[in-house]
């Protein structure tokens, strides 16, 4: 009869969806109700809400109880309930919150079970006779009248509306609350102070929008497959993978790791790629194929290009610097561009202050300050743009690897962002996406053309660059940024290699000269990412690591490996220069095992 709303997210149109599904009631936060402008204070009981003639009962869950249970002493909760009972003897007070608070969150098992909080709490509830009775939501709906009818604004719990704000606005809201929360008028004013809407996580974190847009495309594919007669196991398996990819944890960030956790993003993409592959097989696409399509795949009102075959799926954004923003390896259901940029967060000033003394008492998860590694304040670095591939840099000649790793490099061109023109060239077994832009570098007009070619049955991308209009009397420093996600650092079975020798684990900073090939192996994932070029190349590699907050504390998280081949470009007599690179994604078990064996034998 009732259901739990994930993250207590509410939009009024959900009323009809719930009612049509047979749902009679749900629990939201009292924050939702006060944001609607209700004059009832405190908020107890339940309310009716309606949409298109459909009616559902809504219970306001108490924020005060959310913070008392289980972090306050049991008697504090009893006294709070006693005060309410004295004012409203027959009212219903609702507590609804995460089960993780009772043993899963850090230190809560010891607090709730080992130190006896839960037993004390239940004993004290049982001891109260006459004035206090525990009940269910169903009984409350059946035996108590609604407080009235109310229409709620789009909302979630208070903290999530704050987390969804841009960092600057989030800080302003925190400052406002800190300034006025002890003011005598604050209880009357605070219902008019609220944050943003949860959907803006897709704006705050463009990577969340990428997952969301990809999920929506798969959702449409599942719907179309059903309309076209696909049924049975293929349809149910694809739908199951789609639903798994809709797990909300990966799409946002607050007091918990969320989108900052690579294994969550990887899991979303794994299930989306699984669904895509299942639907291809159901449609009879079992032989090598090649295809390309142009559509607004990320909901920015501009066209993106999907390039795919039986081995790989790529998404390119000509209007955003001509970047490659998704690269799916279908055999292992892995997106090598499930990256995350380094960006400011509202809690980073706390990180800058360094470690403080450990807390002795369990408090709300929202106020917990723990440093999981030393020196995190020195690891706060920010990116000017997304961490994707085919990002084109014109750099100062004295730019160093450390400059790149810190994000401190100076850009001397306008090719890393902005729109490129594009076209798709096709033949029977190969498709090339060409993108070009006439821009400037070092104040000089240049034309940059890049092409991405994929052939049927091939696990490799061929990437060609052509620079035109280069000055004959000077050289330029040109770099192409490639990022590879989901290859974790800090493990012996994930490493750089070149010509059958290891170059170090994936957190290694590499500054190599005059090379033409290098690889990255992840033995656990079962992939060898091999890069090569048709001319001698200087190459930088560095880890991309974020400092983020999770329920267990502040932590350093490896997000991706940045690979930057770079050249001091000397043009030909016509002011032209070119390079061709290959990115081979080898997941063949035989050749992969042979490569690993050769690596180990050499050591």
List where the protein language model places each region.
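Active-site and substrate-binding clefts of carbohydrate-active enzymes
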Residues: 42-56, 60-64, 75-308, 312-321, ...
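Polysaccharide-binding surfaces and accessory modules of carbohydrate-active proteins
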Residues: 459-462, 468-539
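Gly/Pro-rich turn-and-neighbor structural signature
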Residues: 4-49, 104, 294-296, 308-310
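Short, flexible loop/turn elements at secondary-structure junctions
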Residues: 4-9, 22, 29-32, 60-65, ...
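Phosphate/nucleotide-binding catalytic core
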Residues: 1-23, 416, 443-461, 471-482, ...
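Beta-strand-rich recognition/accessory modules
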Residues: 409-449, 456-464, 468-471, 519-603
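Short helix/loop capping segments that flank catalytic or ligand/cofactor-binding pockets
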Residues: 13, 35-36, 67-69, 103-105, ...
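Acidic-aromatic substrate-binding/catalytic surfaces of carbohydrate-active enzymes
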Residues: 310-423, 436
């Amino acid at each position: 009869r009732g259901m739990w709303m994930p993250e207590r997210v509410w939009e009024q149109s959900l009323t009809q969806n719930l009612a049509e599904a047979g749902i009679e009631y749900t629990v939201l936060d009292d924050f939702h109700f006060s944001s609607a402008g209700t004059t009832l204070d405190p908020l107890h009981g339940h309310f009716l809400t309606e949409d298109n003639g459909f009616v559902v009962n809504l219970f306001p869950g108490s924020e005060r109880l959310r913070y008392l249970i289980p972090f306050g002493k049991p008697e504090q909760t009893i006294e709070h309930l006693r005060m309410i009972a004295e004012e409203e003897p027959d009212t219903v007070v609702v507590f609804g919150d995460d089960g993780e608070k009772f043993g899963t969150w850090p230190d809560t098992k010891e607090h709730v079970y080992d130190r006896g909080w839960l037993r004390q709490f239940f004993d004290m509830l049982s001891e109260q006779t006459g004035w206090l009775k525990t009940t269910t939501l169903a009984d409350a709906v059946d035996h108590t009248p609604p407080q009235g009818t109310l229409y709620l604004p789009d909302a979630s719990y208070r903290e999530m509306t704050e987390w969804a704000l841009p960092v600057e606005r989030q800080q302003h809201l925190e400052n406002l609350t800190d300034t006025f929360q002890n003011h005598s008028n604050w209880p009357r004013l605070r219902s008019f102070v609220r944050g943003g809407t949860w959907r803006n996580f897709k704006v705050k974190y463009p990577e969340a929008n990428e997952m969301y847009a990809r999920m929506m495309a798969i959702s449409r594919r599942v719907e179309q497959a059903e309309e076209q007669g696909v049924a049975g196991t293929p349809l149910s398996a694809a739908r199951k993978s789609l639903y798994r990819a809709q797990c909300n944890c990966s799409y946002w960030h607050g007091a918990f790791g969320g989108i900052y956790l690579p294994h969550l993003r990887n899991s979303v993409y794994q299930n989306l790629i699984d669904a895509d592959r299942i639907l291809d097989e159901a449609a009879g696409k079992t032989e090598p194929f090649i295809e390309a399509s142009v559509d607004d795949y990320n909901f920015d009102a501009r066209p993106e290009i999907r390039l795919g075959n039986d081995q790989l799926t790529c998404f390119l954004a000509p209007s955003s610097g001509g970047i490659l923003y998704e690269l799916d390896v279908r055999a292992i259901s892995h997106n090598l561009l499930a990256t995350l940029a380094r960006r400011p967060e509202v809690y980073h000033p706390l990180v800058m202050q360094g470690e403080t003394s450990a807390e002795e008492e369990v408090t709300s998860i929202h106020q917990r300050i723990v440093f999981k590694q030393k020196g995190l304040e020195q690891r706060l670095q920010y990116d000017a743009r997304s961490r994707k591939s085919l990002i084109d840099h014109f750099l100062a000649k004295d730019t160093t690897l450390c400059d790149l790793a810190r994000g401190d490099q100076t850009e001397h061109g306008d090719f890393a962002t902005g729109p490129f023109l594009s076209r798709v060239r096709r033949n029977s077994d190969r498709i090339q996406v060409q993108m070009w832009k006439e821009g400037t570098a070092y104040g000089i007009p240049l034309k940059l053309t890049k092409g991405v070619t994929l052939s049927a049955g091939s696990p490799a991308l061929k990437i060609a660059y052509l620079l035109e209009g280069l000055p004959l009397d000077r050289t330029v420093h040109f770099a192409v940024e490639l990022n590879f996600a989901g290859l974790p650092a800090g493990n012996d079975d994930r490493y750089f290699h070149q010509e059958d020798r290891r170059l170090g684990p994936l957190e290694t900073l590499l500054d190599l000269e005059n090379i033409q090939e290098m690889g990255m192996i992840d033995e656990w994932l079962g992939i060898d990412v091999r890069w090569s070029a048709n001319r001698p190349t200087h190459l930088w590699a560095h880890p991309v690591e974020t400092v983020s907050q999770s329920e267990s504390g502040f932590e350093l998280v490896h997000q991706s490996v940045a690979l930057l081949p770079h050249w001091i470009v000397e043009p030909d007599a016509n002011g032209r220069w070119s390079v061709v690179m290959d990115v081979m994604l080898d997941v063949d078990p035989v050749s992969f095992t042979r490569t690993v064996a050769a690596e180990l034998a050499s050591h």
